[in-house]
Amino acid sequence: MSTLSPRRSAILTFIRDRIAQQGQSPSLAEISEAFGFASRSVARKHIVALTEAGLIEVVAHQARGIRLLNSEPRPELLEIPVLGRVAAGAPIGPDLDIHTTLHLDRSTFTRVPDYLLRVQGDSMIEDGILDGDLVGVHRNPQASDGQIVVARLEGEVTIKRLQHRGDQLHLLPRNPAYQPIIVTPDQDFAIEGVFCGLVRRE
């Protein structure tokens, strides 16, 4: 493998950091913006070069499908329960019985998910999370600004981006057709877990 240029090394670090911080890889548009490229085609050329160098792969037909490659000789399969639905729209009531169990490649996820939820709605489409997707959830009652979380608000469950504003929490949709959900201190609210990847059934 040839030595990476400083620019491509920086792009690889950007991808790795974004996956670690937000649970998903950046889009070509986000890479272009971060590095000041004039168009997405420039970012695409760098992604192709990193792919040819064996450092990443791009999963076809999968949203934000850049995956970091490692030296493991064979995939590690995880057995993950599917626990019903999560709203990408208005929150919905909990439906957390085990529906089925799937065996999925560990490399699909940025961290090992404790369970999967099926997305209902389209409020997260700009983050590449579509109606019908299965999202991996890593149980964690805490999350940082900008992370995608599965949260329970007044007994109902939703998936949104988390943002702190003063003593309020905002659950941000990623579709301009939806309004943010503002969580006040008097409401019954808990973060159930952090998004760590998705599976899309074609």
UniProtKB/Swiss-Prot annotation:
Keyword DNA repair in annotation = yes
Q: Which GO terms describe its biological process?
A: DNA repair; DNA replication; negative regulation of DNA-templated transcription; proteolysis; SOS response
InterPro entries xrefs: LexA (IPR006200), LexA-like (IPR039418), LexA/Signal_pep-like_sf (IPR036286), LexA_DNA-bd_dom (IPR006199), LexA_repressor (IPR050077), Peptidase_S24_LexA (IPR006197), Peptidase_S24_S26A/B/C (IPR015927), WH-like_DNA-bd_sf (IPR036388)
From which domain of life does this come?
Bacteria
Per the record, DNA-binding region residues lie at 28-48
What Pfam families has UniProt attached to this entry?
LexA_DNA_bind (PF01726), Peptidase_S24 (PF00717)
Report which reactions are catalysed by this protein. Answer: Hydrolysis of Ala-|-Gly bond in repressor LexA
Keywords on record: Autocatalytic cleavage, DNA damage, DNA repair, DNA replication, DNA-binding, Hydrolase, Repressor, SOS response, Transcription, Transcription regulation
The UniProt site entry described as Cleavage is assigned to 88-89
- Which residues are the active-site ones? 123, 160
Q: How does it assemble?
A: Homodimer.
Q: Which family does it belong to?
A: Belongs to the peptidase S24 family.
The family database entries (NCBIfam families) matched by this protein are listed as: lexA
Write down what this protein is called. LexA repressor 2
- Organism of provenance: Pseudomonas syringae pv. tomato (strain ATCC BAA-871 / DC3000)
Q: Corresponding gene?
A: lexA2
